[in-house]
């Protein structure tokens, strides 16, 4: 992709010269949809904490530990993965992240114990941490120089998924029980 710097009102803008606008929209849109699906899955976990608490007779400390494991793996791992993939781009990490999330969903749906819930939370977090840095990089690369538009479109996808996840949990998982979490695998497969 060839880029040039243009000044408009004293502000530098990078503009792609040779990437078709339709291709930019399709790629950024696809990454935003994948972000929606990823974050939808991530948002279901905290939404079902009350169900997990009841099913496993967990204390609030144990629910907090589930959240801690998920957040440590899902948040604190991201910068390290981003640092590595900035030096060694790995586009295949997008589907790898979704496969790891897929495994976490299956474990969560059929978890027989608190220890397995922790493993499921860790896998869901690792899947998210693996997905986000590469997906963000792809959105930027496909932006055609419109970095702000690409990033905001990517972010809207994730925020929409975060908004839909708890609603999906209330409508489909809570009425049918913990095993209904397995239905989320379709989102991991689509992502």
Regions found by a protein language model. Give the residues of each.
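MFS 12-TM fold signature
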Residues: 100-105, 124, 188-191
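Residue-level signature of mid-helix packing/kink "hotspots" within the transmembrane helices
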Residues: 43, 71-79, 162-163
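Helix-loop-helix hairpin linking two adjacent transmembrane segments in secondary transporters
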Residues: 154-191
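Cytoplasmic helix-loop-helix junction between adjacent transmembrane helices
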Residues: 120-157
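Conserved MFS/SLC helix-loop-helix module at the cytosolic interface between two early adjacent transmembrane helices
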Residues: 76-114
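Short hydrophobic/alpha-helical segments at membrane-entry points of transmembrane helices
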Residues: 31, 115-121
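Extracytoplasmic
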Residues: 30-50, 58, 81
